[in-house]
Amino acid sequence: MAAPLEAQDQAPGEGEGLLIVKVEDSSWEQESAQHEDGRDSEACRQRFRQFCYGDVHGPHEAFSQLWELCCRWLRPELRTKEQILELLVLEQFLTVLPGEIQGWVREQHPGSGEEAVALVEDLQKQPVKAWRQDVPSEEAEPEAAGRGSQATGPPPTVGARRRPSVPQEQHSHSAQPPALLKEGRPGETTDTCFVSGVHGPVALGDIPFYFSREEWGTLDPAQRDLFWDIKRENSRNTTLGFGLKGQSEKSLLQEMVPVVPGQTGSDVTVSWSPEEAEAWESENRPRAALGPVVGARRGRPPTRRRQFRDLAAEKPHSCGQCGKRFRWGSDLARHQRTHTGEKPHKCPECDKSFRSSSDLVRHQGVHTGEKPFSCSECGKSFSRSAYLADHQRIHTGEKPFGCSDCGKSFSLRSYLLDHRRVHTGERPFGCGECDKSFKQRAHLIAHQSLHAKMAQPVG
C-alpha cells in the first residue's frame, strides 16, 4: 500500500513538471502570435490609410473594403474602446511630431502612447548631435565624396540622410540614368514606377529631386504646379509612414515629363525640412496671374485662390472718414455710403432707395409676396432666412441670448436688448410732447396714444 501512495505522491510532481513546460510553450506561442498579429495589424493600417477609391468598383465595395481593413487594424472584437482610442491617438501623435524626432520614434515602434511620450522625453534629454546627425560609414564617405555635382536646392537639414549609391547593375541596361534618386534609410523598400522618357525604375518616395534656377525657368506653369502637387502629397504620405501604392498617384507621377538636364545617377540628394521646402518654394514659384483654381485638399500645396485670399487679408482699402479697413474696394465703396447717406439702389415699385443691391432685393420681396423660407414644423413661410431661424426657436425652445448680469436667456437678440435696459436704466424712446422717456418703443406708442386722446375735443 505504501508503494502506490508514493507513486501517487510523485504523480502530481511529474504532472506539474509537464504542466510547467506546457505553460512556457503556450506563453512563447502567444508572444509569437502577438508579434505576427502586430505585423499584420501594421500592414492593415498602412493599407487602410493608402486605400484608393479607384482601386475598386463602386462606392459599396470601397466602403466594405475600408471597413474590413479598419477592423483588421483596430481589432474591435479584441480591444476595448479605450485601447482603440489609444491606437488612433498614438498614430496622430506620431504624425504631428517634428520630422526628425518622428522618424527616430517610429523606428522604435512604440506600442502605446505612454511609451511614445517617454521616447520623445528621453530623446529631448540627449544632446542634439547624438540623434540628429546620421554619421555615414567609412566605405560610404569616400564614395560620396568622389561623386559628381551636388544637388541644387536648399541646404540640407541637420541629420539629412544620404541614400547609398545606386548599384552599377541598375545602370548596365542603359546609358541614361534615372531622373529621380532614392532617398531615405538603407534597406527601405519603396514602390517604383517608370516615368515617361526615363529608363529604369523611379521610386515614388523620390520626389525630392531638384531644379536649378535656370532649369526651373524652362518648366511651364502646369508642369510646376504638377511638381509641387506630387512633392507635397508625397511628403504628406511619407510623414504618415506609408508609401504610395495607388494607381492614381502612379499615373500622376508618370505625367511628370521634364527631366533635369545634366543630372546624373551619381548626384547626391538630401532631404528637406518642411520649413526649408516652403522657403525655397516661395522663392522659386512664379507669381503667376491669379486665376480660378479648384480648392485644394488638406495636405496639398496652396492654390492660387488661397494665395489670392492671403493677399486680400492685408485689407489695403481704408476709409478716410473713420479709418476702417477693407479687403476689397467694393466693400469700401459700400461702407462709405453710411457716411454720405447715398442710396443708389431704387425700388421701381415704391421709389424707396437702398445703399446696397442686396437690401433692394430683400425689400422687393415685400411687393412680390415671395416667402421662400418655410418652417418644416408648422409650414409658416418667411421672406428671409434670418426670420425663419428666429421663428424656429419657438419650436426648439432655444434661448441663445443670455444676460450677463442676471443670467436670464432670450430667444431673440432684440428681447435681450430690451431686457438689459432694466439693468442699465437706459430710456432711449422719448416723447416729443412731454419729454418723458421709455425703455421700449411699445411703451412710447401707448403713451403717445394718451396725448392723442387728450387732444381730441370733448363732445
From Swiss-Prot:
Superkingdom in the source lineage: Eukaryota
Entry comment describing in which tissues the protein is expressed: Widely expressed with highest levels in testis.
Location of the region described as Disordered in the Swiss-Prot/TrEMBL record: 128-188
SMART domains (alphabetical): KRAB (SM00349), SCAN (SM00431), ZnF_C2H2 (SM00355)
GO MF terms, alphabetically ordered: DNA-binding transcription factor activity, RNA polymerase II-specific; RNA polymerase II cis-regulatory region sequence-specific DNA binding; zinc ion binding
Zinc finger (C2H2-type): 317-339, 345-367, 373-395, 401-423, 429-451
Location of the protein in the cell: Nucleus
SUPFAM superfamilies: beta-beta-alpha zinc fingers (SSF57667), KRAB domain (Kruppel-associated box) (SSF109640), Retrovirus capsid dimerization domain-like (SSF47353)
Main subcellular localisation: nucleus
Coiled-coil parts of chain: none
Alphabetical keyword list: DNA-binding, Metal-binding, Nucleus, Repeat, Transcription, Transcription regulation, Zinc, Zinc-finger
Any GO BP: regulation of transcription by RNA polymerase II
Family annotation (Pfam families): KRAB, SCAN, zf-C2H2, zf-H2C2_2
Domain SCAN box: 45-126
Signal sequence, renumbered to the chain: none
Family that this chain belongs to: Belongs to the krueppel C2H2-type zinc-finger protein family.
Summary of the function given for this chain in its UniProt record: May be involved in transcriptional regulation.
Entry protein name: Zinc finger protein 213
